[in-house]
């Protein structure tokens, strides 16, 4: 068997096989005899054709025999060639240039298939301490103030106004929202009863806030709201007005939030530390994402099309499941193609790096991680155990642990050159 291999690109192989009749004669006869053994002809027992009956049968069924041999030969010789050349395909493969005319003729075909590309020599020299630039945001007192305000809202109480109480910005109302037609008349079935909103927040700011200020229980306010379908008029009848009473930030409030703390200063310090920890983690995430971008950009190779197509199909199904109405596959096609290509490229690069750096994940590590989670949250022990009994969830945990070990290793090869930026500067830019 003559085997010729041509690399179409990094991930696509053209395999050409040529076999002389002498090499395939025995296999051809085996196929022919198998067909003869199951043949049924008048005047002869099943599989017992002799003489002229056999000759006539073979003549009449030669195309059928040839077709069966080709099916057998393609699979058999292709498999032998792969074993001989130690090649592992990752897709079905497409056959072309098939040449075989039956008895006494040679057999030749070409098959195109994909492989996982060999990228060892394409990986950049990352061991030279590559510098990655990132932004490192620093928490400020205004972050702490915002966190405390959010916490005060969580512990707030509501005070209802009497009929004389006037509505102020920041108050909540319970009101009937009735849609009006072009003539200003109520639309039948167009009332949203006792809807709860906060005046001075979200939609009800600016021009939509002003008509409500100083109104009382029982008053009706007419407003015009910009919606997707156009401007819509509403009559809003106020049924109830509530004022949000925020707790004072003092020692009593501190005790409610965290019984281990004693002073407001301690609470602010803890909040700031937690906020900074989150910002530090965001910086680390940015650092790792830029390491990924570095490898994707610097490692040049052709990604297997079938792997990209399969990942793209997964993305499409995932988007459809999450929000079928909003998802437009045709519109998102360029992004889907780019995301799929990048993810598969990174999958193959990381696979190579994990092997090169001998990053190993033992089964005990996964089980120990699950045990640690159960020990940390004993009240949820049964739920945690049940969750990780599902193979899909355990595989995700395995991937997370492997990813953590991988980036711990990569951290030693890359320098995170941070630019410290106070979060106040970001807020000022947005403002």
Predicted segment positions?
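FKBP-type peptidyl-prolyl cis-trans isomerases
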Residues: 1-431
């Amino acid at each position: 068997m003559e085997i010729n291999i041509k690399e179409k690109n990094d991930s696509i192989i053209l395999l050409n096989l040529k076999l002389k009749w002498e090499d395939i004669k025995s296999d051809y006869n085996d196929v022919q005899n198998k067909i003869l053994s199951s043949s049924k002809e008048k005047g002869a027992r099943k599989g017992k054709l002799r003489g002229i009956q056999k000759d006539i049968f073979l003549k009449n069924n030669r195309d059928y025999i040839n077709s069966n041999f080709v099916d057998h030969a393609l699979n058999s010789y292709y498999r032998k060639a792969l074993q001989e050349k130690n090649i592992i395909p990752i897709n079905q493969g497409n056959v072309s240039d098939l040449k075989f005319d039956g008895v006494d003729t040679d057999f030749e075909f070409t098959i195109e298939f994909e492989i996982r590309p060999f990228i060892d020599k394409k990986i950049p020299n990352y061991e030279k301490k590559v510098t990655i630039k990132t932004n490192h945001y620093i928490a400020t007192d205004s972050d702490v103030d915002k966190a405390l305000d959010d916490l005060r809202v969580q512990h707030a109480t509501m005070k209802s106004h009497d009929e004389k109480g006037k509505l102020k910005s920041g108050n909540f109302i319970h009101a009937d929202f009735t849609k009006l037609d072009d003539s200003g008349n109520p639309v039948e079935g167009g009332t949203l009863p006792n809807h709860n909103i906060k005046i001075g927040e979200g939609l009800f700011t600016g021009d939509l806030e002003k008509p409500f200020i100083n109104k009382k229980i029982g008053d009706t306010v007419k407003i015009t709201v910009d919606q997707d379908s156009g401007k819509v008029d509403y009559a809003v009848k106020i049924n109830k007005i509530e004022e949000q009473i925020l707790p004072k930030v003092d020692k009593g409030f501190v005790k409610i939030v965290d019984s281990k703390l004693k002073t407001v200063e301690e609470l602010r310090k803890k909040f700031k530390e937690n906020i900074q920890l989150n910002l530090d983690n965001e910086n680390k995430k940015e650092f790792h994402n830029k390491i990924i971008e570095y490898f994707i950009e610097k490692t040049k190779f052709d990604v297997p099309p079938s792997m990209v197509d399969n990942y793209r199909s997964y993305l499409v199904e995932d988007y459809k499941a999450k929000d079928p109405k909003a998802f437009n596959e045709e519109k998102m096609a360029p992004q889907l193609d780019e995301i799929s290509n990048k993810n598969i490229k990174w999958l193959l690069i990381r696979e190579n790096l994990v092997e090169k750096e001998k990053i190993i994940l033992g089964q005990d590590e996964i089980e120990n991680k699950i045990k640690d989670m159960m020990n940390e949250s004993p009240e949820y022990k049964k739920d945690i155990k049940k969750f990780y009994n599902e193979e899909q969830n355990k595989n995700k945990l395995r991937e997370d642990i492997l990813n953590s070990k991988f980036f711990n290793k990569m951290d030693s090869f890359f320098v995170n050159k941070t630019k410290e930026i106070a979060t106040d500067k970001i807020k000022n830019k947005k403002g």
